[in-house]
Amino acid sequence: MNNKFDALKDDDSGDHDQNEENSTQKDGEKEKTDRDKSQSSGKRKAVVPGPAEHPLQYNYTFWYSRRTPGRPTSSQSYEQNIKQIGTFASVEQFWKFYSHMVRPGDLTGHSDFHLFKEGIKPMWEDDANKNGGKWIIRLRKGLASRCWENLILAMLGEQFMVGEEICGAVVSVRFQEDIISIWNKTASDQATTARIRDTLRRVLNLPPNTIMEYKTHTDSIKMPGRLGPQRLLFQNLWKPRLNVP
């Protein structure tokens, strides 16, 4: 996908006297210095809905990560491996990103897509996540694309009705199965986690006997490596009843 902001270029090719050339050169150097200072200080242009666009309640950021199977990953190397795709603030901006992204079912190897509220990194150790947890569901191969789309559309549409509790969602593509999860801020709030569970069942049209696992990020941090929920054992790999024309 092309960058949302094109670089500004000065393509003037006419004759200038020496003073104008020096002035232009100085202006260019000043702009470069100002730009470098802005980048080094971490300043970014705020993402806002465009004219006539439909704003979301929160801004969200897409992330992507991929790792080598069987190789333990530290928090530092995991953070370096995860790549930010882009941030959006409206329905229209979301579809501009999503329509250009590979669907989870077409990913290979140990790959993950993450969709989190802007400012929250998809890491257990992030301040917004460290006291929270996630609902985890394992999927048979071939179901991840539809379930992922249903999940993130429900999240963007505020269907979970739990205020600011939702942090984000993850789809993890593995060799024999895929995993989806939704993260919330407060693992100790049983009423909130129960509401998230019930909404997740509804938006994914899960059968009543579907096995769902809630795992706190504190427990995930204690486990060696970055495998987290993939190490949990599930008896049923469910197949949802999808209403397909």
From Swiss-Prot:
Region (Disordered): 1-52
A single Gene Ontology CC term: P-body
Post-translational modifications reported in the UniProt record: Ubiquitinated by ARIH1. The consequences of ubiquitination are however unclear: according to a report, EIF4E2 ubiquitination leads to promote EIF4E2 cap-binding and protein translation arrest. According to another report ubiquitination leads to its subsequent degradation.
Domain of life (superkingdom): Eukaryota
Cross-linked sites for Glycyl lysine isopeptide (Lys-Gly) (interchain with G-Cter in ISG15): K134, K222
InterPro entries assigned to the protein according to its UniProt record, in alphabetical order: TIF_eIF4e-like (IPR023398), TIF_eIF_4E (IPR001040), TIF_eIF_4E_CS (IPR019770)
Record-listed N6-acetyllysine modification sites: K134
UniProt keyword annotations, A-Z: Acetylation, Cytoplasm, Initiation factor, Isopeptide bond, Phosphoprotein, Protein biosynthesis, RNA-binding, RNA-mediated gene silencing, Translation regulation, Ubl conjugation
Phenotype seen when the gene is deleted: Lethality; mice die just before birth.
Residues that, per the record, bind mRNA: Y78, E79, H110, W124, E125, R174, F175, Q176, E177, D178, I179, K222, M223, P224
Location(s) in or outside the cell: Cytoplasm; Cytoplasm, P-body
Tissue: Widely expressed with highest levels in testis, kidney and liver.
MF (Gene Ontology): RNA binding; translation initiation factor activity
Primary location class: cytoplasm
UniProt biased composition (Basic and acidic residues): 1-38
Signal peptide positions on this chain: none
In-chain residues carrying the UniProt-annotated modification Phosphoserine: S13
Stretches the record annotates as EIF4EBP1/2/3 binding: 54-57, 95-99, 150-157
Biological role stated in the UniProt entry: Recognizes and binds the 7-methylguanosine-containing mRNA cap during an early step in the initiation. Acts as a repressor of translation initiation. In contrast to EIF4E, it is unable to bind eIF4G (EIF4G1, EIF4G2 or EIF4G3), suggesting that it acts by competing with EIF4E and block assembly of eIF4F at the cap. In P-bodies, component of a complex that promotes miRNA-mediated translational repression. Involved in virus-induced host response by mediating miRNA MIR34A-induced translational silencing which controls IFNB1 production by a negative feedback mechanism.
Family: Belongs to the eukaryotic initiation factor 4E family.
Name of protein: Eukaryotic translation initiation factor 4E type 2
Record organism: Mus musculus (Mouse)
Protein's gene: Eif4e2
